[in-house]
Amino acid sequence: MKGLAFCTAILFLVGSLPGQEAPSPADVARYGQYPADYKEIIMKWLDTQLVDAPSARIEWTSEPKATDYEKNGEHFYGYLVTFTVNARNRFGTYTGKQRHGAVIKNGEVIKGLGLGY
């Protein structure tokens, strides 16, 4: 009897754990599709932002998270990804790790954080 009560309690607790729910249509309309290929999207964007993009050493510090990023009264809805970049500058020396982020919506970066933004 105790074993049955224990198993029932465990099933109840496991069933109530928060899981990765499918985004609602309203969320997709606001934030866009979840960027499963976020690393490729950001690397392509960094190619246009860095002086020596091939030298970039990237460390990903977060998975994409739905966000409402606001700056100067303007809202950017999408998925925020944070990362560090260590790349060569115009003088050919590495800059050291610097924290950056990007807001992705529908497969493209709509707002960069860091990199002079």
Where are these regions (language model features)?
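Cystatin/cathelin-like cysteine-protease inhibitor module
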Residues: Q20-Y117
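Sec-dependent N-terminal signal peptides
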Residues: L4-V14
